[in-house]
Amino acid sequence: MAGRPLPSWREGAARSTILGWLDRATGPGPGHVPLVDRVAVFDNDGTLWTERPTYTQALFIADRLRAAAAVDAGLAADPVLQALLTGGLGAAMAHGLDALAGLVLKAQAGMTADAFLADARSWFATSRHPSGRPYPATVYQPMLELLDLLRSHDFRSFIVTGGGVEFVRAVSWPLYGIPPADVIGTAVQLRLERHDGRAELVREAAFDGPPNEGAPKAVNIHRHIGQRPVIAAGNSDGDREMLEYVATGEPSDLCLLLEHDDPEREDVYGGRSVTTDPDAEPVGTVARRSGWTVISMRSDWTQVFPAAPS
């Protein structure tokens, strides 16, 4: 790559560790990683794009539920949707994630996979984040640079998200240069239907397995990729098992934990996940004890988001 690698990263331990690891992994000496083993996995929410004030997919869901309520009186009577309409997303989420997820599944049941894909892409391209930024400008510029750097060294990067796999696949290529086939996430059950000579996949009102958080991330990496990655990046307790799975490989493997400690440019919050054990040891403590590379958004990045188009 021309110019200074990782240009939005400050000189410091995190940048030096990443570049030093890559030099060893792609050089001829100890620590060399063969081409076939150059696999990296990245969490998405809070690792590749912002998850503040809430998850991007939750904002998409809220918009689509409001639209559905206008044409479906039965759906509009649901207490969770009533909370959304009168008190916003926070009020709806107060009913619990299971209740909100069930409402979403019900509202989107019967939609074809292709229609969902087109809807997600349209929303992403035309809607605005609560910050006022277009959604493509809510990704983290330094992480885009890391993905580009890995690509230039023949690494294949996968997204391993707790979010909906179809939602992230809708935008993974234009945002990150990661093809839809290389996205692993929480899945909805699908059925095949035939209409007018066409075979279509249709969404059902049920998840296909547990949410892709915690231990399922490691399991689904093995199922989807078939080998242990050599790089992992995350930011929350929901990523702990994925990071541990990668760290349990060769001693040279690289584990990265992003900490959100920048109130001026993004937010300050810990790595707790709403879907994992609240009594578990914090992932930041695990990272420091295990010798993983901890990235400070405030100290290690000169720029957080890409320049937003006018």
Specify the residue positions occupied by each region the protein language model found.
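C-terminal cap/substrate-recognition subdomain and adjoining C-terminal extension
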Residues: 1-23, 32, 114-310
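Charged, low-complexity surface segments at secondary-structure and domain boundaries
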Residues: 1-8, 47, 89, 100-106
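N-terminal carbohydrate-binding/catalytic regions of secreted carbohydrate-active enzymes
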Residues: 21-26, 31, 35-38, 52
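Asp-based phosphoryl-transfer active-site loop
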Residues: 37-54, 243
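Short catalytic/ligand-binding loop motif for oxyanion handling, primarily in non-cytosolic enzymes
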Residues: 50, 58, 167-168
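A metal-dependent, Asp-based hydrolase signature
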Residues: 53-137, 141
